């Protein structure tokens, strides 16, 4: 078992503005604030999302593209984690539930664009998650 232990850390509140990629926005904040690793939680709305689930048979994600037409994709739950890899790049892993006119869709958030915005919290744990989540 690999175990990461961090202290009670910094909590950063973010407002991801309309038209902005969630992953890029979070990655920029993690890099600029020199964060190490922690949790992501959020709610809000999306204009566009690519949501997938992993197929162990093909070892690929089966992806569904969702786009808001007359409304938004309401983010009822967004949770994940982030960490900085040894090469300095930021790894972000997010799962999401989205309320749509056709029901709720959920899975791995591969891409998401905010509309009108997202309220996101980064809970920095100061963890070296790269040594734990070596598969990423």
Describe the residue ranges of each PLM region.
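Generic N-terminal amphipathic, Lys/Arg-enriched alpha-helix
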Residues: 1-14
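Structural motif
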Residues: 12-13, 37-41, 73-74, 94-95, ...
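Short, structured patches in soluble enzyme cores that scaffold and shape functional sites
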Residues: 18, 98-100, 122-126
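Short, well-structured hydrophobic secondary-structure segments
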Residues: 21-69
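Glycine-centered structural positions embedded in regular secondary structure
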Residues: 38, 44, 77-81, 106-111
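Mid-chain, well-packed structural core segment of small domains
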Residues: 62-106
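Flexible glycine-rich active-site/ligand-binding loops centered on an Asp-His dyad
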Residues: 107-136
